[in-house]
Amino acid sequence: MSPIILLSIVLQIACGVHVVRTGRPMYWLFILLFFSYIAVLIYFIAEILPDMRNGPGSRKVARKVRDVIDPGRDKRRAEINLQLSDTQANRRELAAESLRHGDYQRAAELYQGSLKGLYATDPDLMLGLARAQFGMGQPQQARDTLDALIAANPDFRSKEGHLLYARTVEDIGDVAAALHEYEAVVQGYPGEEARVRYGLLLKRTGDSRRAADIFREILTRSAASPKYYQREQRDWIETARQELSRL
């Protein structure tokens, strides 16, 4: 027998034993059985490496791999947790997973159901509800929720929430307010999305010179940034490059 095939069998068996002993999902056995070295590599990255190096980077990689193999896994787990125990924490978890999977209706129901009693004005819950409403194509309701959040929690700060507010007023058609909000949120926003959206709105309003300045700033900033940042922001950087070429 070829040494390569023999090594593959040994690794598959070792990973299979790990699946059974550690209580991993049984679908891993079928993946390991049919996909040889590729399956072993994926299993190592998704299930073994996080245990060896329980850092945020490892967890992020593992989650990406699991999302490709079984995209609904975390949401199903959150559903089960809520069925077993209807707690505020479990509602938040399922609401967040529903948002992540684009199930905005379910997320909105969970957030609305959680906004009561001591949590009636919880800023994180209100922001989650606004995100769900915006995802359902309800920018006015999202803006109303964000306005209520601001009124109830004047000291609350969230860059993502601020960007969402800018997007809601833009979608409603309040261009002047949207420009004002985008101009404010781009200051210190951790990424290029806010700047790209600001540039696109400036372009639509006819301010091509200012839009070009924003897109150039994005390209200059990203060129001087670390490689990981360029990878994470690749889509927004490419949008800025294309839009600048059209001006």
Q: Which residues does each predicted region cover?
A:
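Long, contiguous interaction/recruitment modules in multidomain scaffold/adaptor proteins
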Residues: M1-L84, R106-E109, G113-Y119
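Conserved small-residue packing positions in alpha-helical repeats and bundles
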Residues: A62-R66, A95, A130, A166, ...
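TPR-repeat structural position
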Residues: P71, Q88, Y104-Q105, P139, ...
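Alpha-helical adaptor scaffolds
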Residues: A96, R100, Q112-G188, E193
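TPR/TPR-like alpha-solenoid helical repeat scaffolds
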Residues: R131-A132, K159-D171, G199-G206, K227-L247
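TPR/TPR-like (Sel1-like) alpha-helical repeat modules
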Residues: V186-Y189, K203-S225
